Amino acid sequence: MEHELLHIVEQAKVLPKLLENRVKDPVKGITYPQRYIFILLQKYLKDFFKEGAEPRMVGLAGLRGVGKTTLMWQLARYAYNNITTNIWFFNVNSLMNLGYSIQEALLRMEEVLGCKLNVYDKPIVFLFDEVHDDPKWAKTLKILYDECRTAFVIATGSSALLINQTPDLAARMKVEKIYPFKF
């Protein structure tokens, strides 16, 4: 069991090929369009890593299929090309399906990184897709925010759950609502 989770965490490291695959249509090979909100989210990333500005935890909330995950990957590609290659992606639905929580994955992250997250001093980006699938997601992300001060966190999830988060996390996470494209 422990080796399985360690393997999952090791595979969570984002590599260039994965980034390119996630921002393009798999059949047509065309890069997905960027939303206007990308510019604001890009600014959050730049400002945190350049000046230490808040927010450093962003929730992308919206209906299923509106493009939250694609937007997250577009931000990851920007961060990879301009800020840090130290980016980690966790599909929380898959983690939970295998019987693991976000907290368990983060504990294994410490093994992979070679130190506790509360003393980690390099720029790092965490991507959590479908974060609401973990019942303890809000508490876990609050702890991650408080302990890993060099981390920028992007989480996608259900509108209702992200918007109605715990009061502790509400002060830490900036929730951006993602709406369907209009044609």
Question: Where does each model-flagged region fall?
Answer:
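Phosphate-binding site recognition
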Residues: 1-183
